[in-house]
Amino acid sequence: MLPLLKQVLDNFNFDVDPALTPEQNTEEVIRSAALLAGAIAAEPLPFADLLLITPLQVKMVLHIGKIHGFEISPARAREIVQELGATLAYGMVARQVMRGVAKLALPVIGGLITAPAVYGWTYALGRTSEVYFQRKVTGQPFGKPQQTLVAQEARKSSRNILPSASDFSDLARELRRRAEEKTSSEVKTGSDTKGSDSKAAPDAADVTAEKPSRPLN
């Protein structure tokens, strides 16, 4: 599962396009994150989406913050996801658990049921994060009632741009293929290196300790 997570995060890189408005840049980030989240949910792995989607959403918030002039740490981005996610997630965890159970019984069908919901949830979190940073810039409050309203409107609008089931499943297969290909390549490289090291093992007397290039403390 870790190779798949790394592949997902590697595929979600974003540079702010100065030719676009902040709103347009944010739209690209949110849609990309939501599509990747839906693809993860389409994977026939029980509860995989619960484990993989949070790191993706954290990276989404990092990107949105950067677009609005905020350089925040991953730890702070995670806190924002948890804070805003609490507003969005009433009942979501229970539904995700039930969908995880569905994947145990009917892996492919369970994944296809989950993908649209996770897409909408991630899209709503992205939109709520966007308003969160906009309010930070202007110094306006953004309490729970306002967060809930923004999230509800975003969930509704996400249905109009929802990708097809084949879009989710095709991307999921491609991510899985790349992750497996990369893992296989790394295993082969490690095996070749180990074989080379065993053939040319240095004599103990020739090994000298190197001083660190910078202080370790």
Regions found by a protein language model. Name each.
Residues 87-98:
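A generic, lipid-embedded transmembrane alpha helix
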Residues 1-40, 56-80, 84, 88, ...:
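Terminal, membrane-proximal amphipathic helices
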